[in-house]
Design a protein with these regions (language model features):
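Single-stranded nucleic acid-binding surfaces, predominantly the OB-fold ssDNA-binding core
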Residues: 1-96
């Protein structure tokens, strides 16, 4: 199973673009900060995650402004074939 849910602030929005077949694509960065418990100890997390939304979801995500808090559900995939870098492919985006 490859499923991820994360909440954070929209940090950077790229311009809307289209694939050669006409599918809308919106890429953005999500800034996440949280405290979790690991091995019984608190651990502070702060990271930026690359996100891509496609199709109708990309059009909907255009209404999201910088700094807006969102909850995203989706899956991780390599940025390109054989890459060690991953990004979150959004399947649901909810503004908080």
């Amino acid at each position: 199973m490859n499923r991820l849910e994360v909440q954070g602030q929209v940090f950077e929005l790229s311009p809307l673009r289209y694939t050669p077949s006409g599918v809308a694509v919106l890429e953005f960065l999500l800034s996440h900060e949280a405290e979790v418990i690991e091995a019984g100890q608190p651990r502070r997390l702060a990271f930026t995650l690359a996100v891509v939304a496609m199709g109708d979801l990309a059009q909907m995500a255009l209404t999201t402004s910088l700094g807006c808090t969102v909850r995203i559900q989706g899956f991780l995939a390599p940025v390109r074939k054989d890459s060690q870098k991953f990004r979150l492919h959004a399947q649901q985006i909810q503004q908080i």
